[in-house]
């Protein structure tokens, strides 16, 4: 699935008149493309408030990031759980009205989650870097900044806000971008979870030989529907390669019951990222225990 970057001139002049109309190539083809295009604007606005140089100075005073990979690998719960804090989504709207990031983070840690994922996209998911900062103050678990990263600036901002790891999405980044952004994260000693949606994207990632955390997203980017067959089919083909290369495969999205977890664990999935299943339930603790006590 090709995700285009925002055209530099979203409007075109009509003859000599003093107005412009939208360029036909300036219309996003899908929600993912719309999100990515908005990131360009968002990053420019962030830079007006805090410069990259100021972020770098702040990072120099921070402790070493926590080990995301190790926490999943050594998790007592199998597969290891990346529990997500997410208020809303483009497809479902507000998922959790009673949204208290601090209490949710404390709950996740007490239940045995390996790591916590925090949505920081504001426009489409009602997240923020302020929420990430709140969660950082509330837990000792490694934190993943869950966003649509297209710029090094976002990585530095994530680190300053308390993230130990970032998400890179293969569908929105070229190979050169993936290598460059991974290098930035490596320099900051941050972990990188790279996300794929199909075999073509996974092949790209494996050829780069740079990633030891690979997330298989079960969500179709065109329809936003989820299907665990994505993880199952890719694991059937690539499980041995993951094992040989010490790659931790993580299944993301569409995990709703203990049977789902058992089927994923049985095919070699080492970690799961679960958000909406917890967020839509009034009692997160009960929802968590219902998923994990029987496996």
UniProtKB/Swiss-Prot annotation:
Pfam families: IGPS (PF00218). Its EC number is 4.1.1.48. PROSITE patterns: IGPS. The gene is trpC. It is an enzyme of class 4 (lyase). GO terms for molecular function: indole-3-glycerol-phosphate synthase activity; phosphoribosylanthranilate isomerase activity. InterPro entries: Aldolase_TIM, Indole-3-glycerol_P_synth, Indole-3-glycerol_P_synth_dom, Indole-3-GlycerolPSynthase_CS, RibuloseP-bd_barrel. GO terms for biological process: L-tryptophan biosynthetic process. It comes from the Bacteria. Belongs to the TrpC family. Keywords: Amino-acid biosynthesis, Aromatic amino acid biosynthesis, Decarboxylase, Lyase, Tryptophan biosynthesis. CDD domains: IGPS. It comes from Prochlorococcus marinus (strain MIT 9301). It catalyses: 1-(2-carboxyphenylamino)-1-deoxy-D-ribulose 5-phosphate + H(+) = (1S,2R)-1-C-(indol-3-yl)glycerol 3-phosphate + CO2 + H2O. This is Indole-3-glycerol phosphate synthase. Pathway: Amino-acid biosynthesis; L-tryptophan biosynthesis; L-tryptophan from chorismate: step 4/5.
